[in-house]
Amino acid sequence: MPTRIDRRFEELAKAGRAGLVTFVMAGDPDLSTSLEILHALVRAGADVLEVGMPFTDPMADGPAIQAAGLRALKAGMTLRKTLDMVAAFRAKDATTPIILMGYYNPIYIFGVEAFLNRAKEVGVDGLIVVDLPPEEDEELCLPARAAGLNFIRLATPTTDAVRLPAVLANTSGFLYYVSITGITGAGVPDYSKVASAVAGIKAHTNLPVAVGFGVKTAESARTIACHADAVVVGSAIVDALRASLDGEGRATPACIGTVEKLVAELAEGVRSAAAAA
């Protein structure tokens, strides 16, 4: 049965454009503001929402997203509350796809079966769990897919033709191509290499390919959108939110508008790629 993610990418393909996937950390800077931000992202033009599950040791994340996770944890955010926040979002938005992104430890502690049951119940559509390789698919990937959730994997510039089939084997929804080596928010992608990498991946799969890491401006989003099925932006949004907080890291009246303005610019950049094609 198709998920919201599957349907959204079908809609984007029919519209002839790439999608915008936005990342924010659940509970940053607090639960109520975080929920408002999710709705603001959709208003601004986000096609798919990635919601970070706060964790104390986020090894793939750069300083911006690490700091966002710490703010969320300090504000009392938990995995249970993250799932509750998705339920609250779904009360007003039944169509926008939501992906939970993070690390396996909080899910393991919560209990895999309990987590998947609750995730499905509240309206989560997919998972990105960056520290579970394909060799560990029985831990979470296969149970998640059996529960009706997409399991989205990452490929990187170092994923070669020998490794790629294993990465793709149980991936569903889309493949997330990491455009740079290293942590989130570090550096700028080499756009010529991104184009060839996406083409190489598409030779092995019919899945949509989303490209992220290092996308910070409307222009860079536009450039990536010329080559990918979706553009993923996280650190730039998290940074904009941080800059709108007060000196104690608390929400201000500027938070929602600041994020909404940036994402509207990113969405326009992505959409302009289709207009120029």
Swiss-Prot record:
GO terms for molecular function: tryptophan synthase activity. It is an enzyme of class 4 (lyase). It catalyses: (1S,2R)-1-C-(indol-3-yl)glycerol 3-phosphate + L-serine = D-glyceraldehyde 3-phosphate + L-tryptophan + H2O. SUPFAM superfamilies: Ribulose-phoshate binding barrel. Pathway: Amino-acid biosynthesis; L-tryptophan biosynthesis; L-tryptophan from chorismate: step 5/5. The active site is at 50 (proton acceptor), 61 (proton acceptor). Its EC number is 4.2.1.20. Keywords: Amino-acid biosynthesis, Aromatic amino acid biosynthesis, Lyase, Tryptophan biosynthesis. Gene3D superfamilies: Aldolase class I. The alpha subunit is responsible for the aldol cleavage of indoleglycerol phosphate to indole and glyceraldehyde 3-phosphate. Tetramer of two alpha and two beta chains. Belongs to the TrpA family. This is Tryptophan synthase alpha chain. The gene is trpA.
